[in-house]
Amino acid sequence: MVAEMIGVVDDDASILRAVQRLLGSLGFTVKTFGSGEDLLASDCLERIHCLVLDVHLGGLSGFELQERLSEAPVQIPIIFITAHDDPPTRDRARRAGAVEYLRKPFDEHALIGAIEKALGRR
């Protein structure tokens, strides 16, 4: 069986490394991207089962990227993450259809639970 692919978009390399290590240790295939533009230019969008997406990115914001992805034929479940948490941002993430919204630094169990929820495992 092919491992489910999780995409992670964040402009913080330490977050990308930590999430890749964690999810890789659980058997997921993990693709990391330093920007929304990098994700859009990649050839693996159709293979991503879930996207962990930073709200505040250089270039396209997480919300702008989510808007573009919402026009695609296949919808990817999104988990928004952010270090700049506030009620309007949380509300916007929920309105955008986020599976989950996590504040950095987030607990690894919270991320795993959110991914399981996004993949329909719970």
Roles of regions detected by a PLM:
Residues 3-13, 19, 23:
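Conserved acidic segment of CheY-like receiver
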Residues 32-50:
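Acidic, metal-coordinating helix/loop segments flanking the phosphotransfer/catalytic sites
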Residues 34-35, 61-64:
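Acidic catalytic/metal-coordinating carboxylates
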Residues 54, 82:
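Active-site residues of response regulator receiver
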Residues 63-74:
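Short amphipathic alpha-helix used as the core "switch/output" element in two-component signaling
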